[in-house]
């Protein structure tokens, strides 16, 4: 895909990916370099690895208990089931059913495609978000109650991203789903996470505008949830 002339930094691949791809284990991003120097890939595998090695308030982000672990895995799997619909199963070649590609190419959100699928009690996407809502522990604030897990981190990232790169706002996903909102707001208040996004805010401002899409806006919900002004 060629970049629109005169845009810096280039919003699409500038050739870097062609050089990097052969060095990745699965031909995809993200990747993570382990202390041994080995490179691993696949998003959820990376999340589980990090979750087994990172603690929050004395608890690992990937649970030790098998029953809790399967709840975390199934929740993350459900989030991944939503991705193909929002990206577009046929990619940019079928742009009218590719919500993410539509905004990336500066064509705006595909409301006519998304709104029926998010209709309460009827839409297939709405049902999937309802499943996520119902899976979260009632006592909260997180999926497993008081214990933060990597599933909550993935939910925070997904809702923030989808609420700017696919939907005009997060509202369509959060309306009548208070537990999802409670979880992502709680994640955003974690100091290390808010500092991470705060440190990157200025660099996001340098991102280009393509058509009606200001690429910096892709990060607006991360800043909102982290209460970064």
Predicted features along the sequence, with ranges:
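Active-site-flanking alpha-helical
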Residues: 51, 55, 158-159, 197
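Charged/polar, low-hydrophobicity segments characteristic of intrinsically disordered regions
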Residues: 86-88, 186-205
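A short hydrophobic/aromatic micro-motif that marks alpha-helical segments and, especially, helix-coil
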Residues: 57-58, 83, 166-167, 205-206
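C-terminal helix/juxtamembrane-tail motif
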Residues: 194, 201-229
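GST-like fold's C-terminal all-alpha helical module
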Residues: 71-189
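GST-like domain detector, emphasizing the conserved glutathione-binding G-site
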Residues: 1-119, 138, 219-229
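Generic, ordered loop/turn and secondary-structure boundary motif
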Residues: 41, 61-63, 143-145, 174-175, ...
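Residue-level recognition of oxygen-bearing side chains
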Residues: 45, 179, 192
